[in-house]
Amino acid sequence: MVNLMRKFAKSIGRPGTEFWRGEDMISALPDHLLCHILIFLSTDESVLTSVLSSRWRNLWKWVPRLDLNTSDFPYPNDVTCAAFIDKFLNLYNESYLREFKLRIDQANFRSNVSLYEPCLGVVIKKPNVRHFQVESDLLEHWCTSEIRLTLSACQALVCLKLHLVWLNDFESLSLPCLKIMYLEDVVFPSDAAAETLISCSPVLEDLKLSLHRDDVVVVLRVYSQSLKSFTLKRAVPVYAINGAHTVLVDTPRLVYMSLIDYQFKSFKIISMSDYVKVDLDVDFELMRDELSERNIVYDLLNNFSGVRNMTISWTTLKFIHRFHDMNPLPKFRDLTRLRATMSSDASLEVLRIVLESCPKLKHFHFTLELVNDFPEAVITGFSRVLPRCLVFSLESVEMESPITEKATELKLVRYFLENSATLKKLVLLLNHESTGEKHEPGVLKQLIESPRRSSLCQFEVLAVPPNPEPWWIYVKPQRFL
């Protein structure tokens, strides 16, 4: 309870010790301010304040926000939580609730999530609900039961976040105020339903989609005149059986796009902003036809030939290298800023491919990783023909690397120092703890003092800060919600 009161004190700008010395200043505030303070607590914490005094007994009931975790309710969790929601909704008129958040604990495989469907249907229809969020604490492939939801016209809804929810079909839908929509492992009933959900949101700005393994959408159409940020994530590759085969994107105001675990056969961008930033972490491992795979990779990348800012993962670069001789990488003719990750063993060859594809590159940040997934023989040196960007445009390079057995990182530094005519800054970030390897004495000093093609180039060697979390610490898989 003390911690709760300290939260209150902090929310009004008074230190906890000062709060406890004097009179109860918080309780003297008017009801609407106290309710505003309680908004920053979960509903479970808010209910606890009812025992502070008679002044607080019923205040939690007037907070226009429900933030619930089913694990906080006594067994059977789903029965008691659903009953609590029903009782709360019946206490007040329909214009009261503004925000609803429900986290469903399915760790108990006896959970009955269908109990929530009636009350969720009531909440989503409330005329003044601005934030609606339903999520499960399990990963997609551990989910054993379905949470079904029917969307309807939601005139005030600004933020919609759903995780592991099966959407029922709908004939019409209107979301005139919706700006944020995160749908993670959500199953659409049809192509038309997915398209309608996006197109009926005329002010939508931020869209994140993670397709479920059971999704039946064949053609995913993302048509929006207002969308600014779009993230598309595929189901875990092992489970990617069904789902979209074609993606069409028509988003003229889009300034950020991220593709993760890509498994689509066709991806076409009709329109997007000239200043869009693209993050690519795509994977094609389920395909067996090399010709089709090669064309799909090329067609996907060709969509981004005009972007100016890009981040690309080693997963994607590995496929680019694999088919480079048969189908060269498209020219990223306007790309000036690039972040990339690559295998240290393949970096000498892959770096050449990347630089040759970016004739106007100015700023390059790349990370070397120690991965054993590159069985092909690779070159041990560079071509004498210099990429155009080294001669005319490259201004800054930042490389993060472990100390490798073959000192690959030093070879790359020498390459940039000796060949970059316009380079102004080169930074080598060394991770001294990852491999246990050490450079020969004096080698870094020699490198710092070595001649450079660009007289303006400043070269620095910095240590990567140690990771505060040991490798055995469990890291929760990245989620949208």
UniProtKB/Swiss-Prot annotation:
Start and stop residues of the LRR repeats: 126-153, 159-185, 186-211, 214-234, 236-261, 289-314, 340-368
Keywords, in A-Z order: Leucine-rich repeat, Repeat
GO cellular component: chloroplast
Pfam families: F-box, FBD, LRR_2
Keyword Kinase included in the entry's annotation: no
SUPFAM superfamilies: F-box domain, RNI-like
Domain of life: Eukaryota
Species this chain originates from: Arabidopsis thaliana
Domain FBD stretches: 378-430
Residues covered by the F-box domain: 23-69
Protein name, as recorded: F-box/FBD/LRR-repeat protein At5g18770
